[in-house]
Amino acid sequence: QAQEVYDKVAYCKAPRIGRGVRLDRKIRMQIWDVFDEYQNIMNEKLQRDVETAMYECRKILENKKLTGQYTSIIVDEGQDLSPSAYRLLRALAGEEHENDIFIVGDSHQRIYRNKAILSKCGINVRGRSSYLRINYRTTEEIRKFAFGLLNGVSFDDLDEDYDNGKGCQSLTHGDKPEIKEFATLEEELDYLVSRIHELEASGVEQKNICIVARTHKLLDNYIAGLQRAGIKSFEIKANKTDDRSFDGVRIATMHRVKGL
């Protein structure tokens, strides 16, 4: 779908660079049968997944000559948009013109598998892009720790080049991140409870403490553990704002705190 391949012949010829697993023609034919049946079911239900919806919207704009609906389009968190999304935005903006599309993105913050090469989506940024090197949100200690984890990993610049992250710096400072290791979940929960009490004793309110986990299962374990210790918690969910009138430790998945 990222390559907007919607027929069997094109699918068998579509490149799979970077996908990891090689598929010969026989396997591709078998996979196509599954995808074709999926498309038939979606058509019967008059439903579309996001990628197909964006593709069909763009085709409607192009076929009815409705492109160029907006003078300027601004994109934030551009690293998370798919090729289909960028092609749709290109159609909405129309032919290339001054200040047509402004994109802000950071591939280091990409948490979805969407990866678009802007030049292949009709968006020319070569010689027109700028790097923002000053971080006003994260402390220098956290920034160094994060880039240390990413050492040796290559990141794209949202086009056909790479961003090595060199030259970035933060203007604020704070404590160095600590790494704690635990043999069991119970040990981890005991530490969390004691750490929360330490922070409270130093004057930090519970609602200014946030526990972040990779999965919802881990969140459920943390919520149950805090409840047993008599500590209130407030889970930050999708489409639900953080109610600051409610006391309690904030708890969320890594997806929910993205951008904070």
Regions found by a protein language model. Name each.
Residues 1-4, 32, 36:
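P-loop NTPase catalytic cores that bind/hydrolyze ATP
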Residues 1-27:
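ATP-hydrolysis module of ASCE/P-loop NTPase motor domains
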Residues 7-14, 45-55:
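Short coil/turn segments at secondary-structure boundaries
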